[in-house]
């Protein structure tokens, strides 16, 4: 498939480029950046010097069609994707949007995001791209709302439990930490090295835009209404997310039984690994894996589920490629089998 990336100079786009270069059936034919028009990617990023990429151009539907694009990735920030989505509504190719602009219905979006919502009719055309749980719908979709990074980590840990009605849906407490790439490429005081190095910072307490995404998608998939408390932290890492979910189980199982239960639930999934060792971000960084660990506190009776993934891969570009594989009829793991960096 011939691919165009819009917002080609951002972190998620760079990861997309890296993954597409590893994919035997995906080819980059156009790179779009309204802010860096007419520049070369290898002038902006020295690690690309050994490759020849298309010159960056401004967004143009005519150009996208001229290079015979089959698959377009929107790697633009929320609020920016919306203006492109309007122009792409009648386009015949496939769009995978990595922003949050298609994930929520209008009233929720405008409550949690500081932007005007995309058209309701257009939003309803989109399929939520949590691959392991929406695979059949993704196959036939031409408009994908790629999930958020925190939402991916949390939903992969929660959905098996919610589907079986084995936890209290009103007692879900989540603490989630993200590497700095999750804050995007634009420099802020909070992501400045002096402020972020040797520091852990709480941000958007109970106000993160992935809260309604988690709640609405959980209800859509399982039919069960949930409420979550979410505390999010920036930690001095380049990439990675660890989400720790404290839950109240409604059935009695031992820790070993809960772990076996999760293994059974995800036994067919190539990118979900249920482990017996304590989780760490390094075990997933640089890969499309999500590692899940399960703990039971016999003193309080509470269940803790920990999900670890790479926010740039499984939480963004990797999941987008996974969805592209599903749409293209390719093996789901194609181009995504690289092991974690670890060191």
Curated annotation (Swiss-Prot):
Per UniProt, what is one GO molecular function of this protein?
A: N-acetyl-gamma-glutamyl-phosphate reductase activity
Q: Which cysteines are joined by disulfide bonds?
A: none
Catalytic residues as annotated in Swiss-Prot or TrEMBL = 149
Q: In the UniProt record, does the keyword Transit peptide occur?
A: no
Its pathway, per UniProt, is: Amino-acid biosynthesis; L-arginine biosynthesis; N(2)-acetyl-L-ornithine from L-glutamate: step 3/4
Q: Which reaction does it catalyse?
A: N-acetyl-L-glutamate 5-semialdehyde + phosphate + NADP(+) = N-acetyl-L-glutamyl 5-phosphate + NADPH + H(+)
SMART domains associated with the record? Semialdhyde_dh
Subcellular location, record wording: Cytoplasm
The GO biological-process annotations, alphabetized, read as: L-arginine biosynthetic process
Extract the CDD domains matched here: AGPR_1_C (cd23934), AGPR_1_N (cd17895)
Q: Would the keyword tRNA processing be found if you checked this record's keyword annotation? A: no
Q: What class of enzyme is it?
A: oxidoreductase
User: E.C. number, please?
Assistant: 1.2.1.38
Q: Which family does it belong to?
A: Belongs to the NAGSA dehydrogenase family. Type 1 subfamily.
The protein in question is named N-acetyl-gamma-glutamyl-phosphate reductase
Q: Give the classification, highest ranks.
A: Bacteria, Bacillati, Bacillota, Bacilli, Bacillales
